[in-house]
Amino acid sequence: MGPHIDTLEEKIIEEGSGPLKVLLIDVDGPISNRPKKTLTGFDRETGMVDRIREILKKADRDKNIKGILLRINSPGGTVTSSDIIYHEIKSFKERHNLKVYVSVVDIAASGGYYVAMSGDTIIMHPTSLTGSIGVLAIKVNLKGLMGKVGVEWEIVKSADKKDFMSPFR
């Protein structure tokens, strides 16, 4: 069986007196469009990008939606998936002239941070973790080689550590 999108349904979190609604979108877990395996291993849940696109497509038809609450708890994910989700939410909010409120539960790192930038207001707990986290950086040190072949260099910089990734340092 291939990936599928579960039936999207409207859930009333708190009964109100009017018809207006807030669209709740959860970005929970790694951001990717790879389908997730279910416990049986046969079925697969759809990837996050497709799921959010489907939510926004359905919400496009509901004129009672007056705002979006984007609830993020993600360590990040792929750049492309994060970028697509960011732009899908920005496009939806601009088409419908809505505000997007972001709530960071525990973590919005890397791609989670990127997606959060689609919001107008970001609300975080003081102990929530956020930021762009680089997992790996490689620095090549050519200082010894350049000395052997007689190449000299001069670095012009505006601050002490501006050249920290320079291969000549």
Model-derived features: positions:
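Small-residue-centered hinge/linker elements
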Residues: 1-98, 104-169
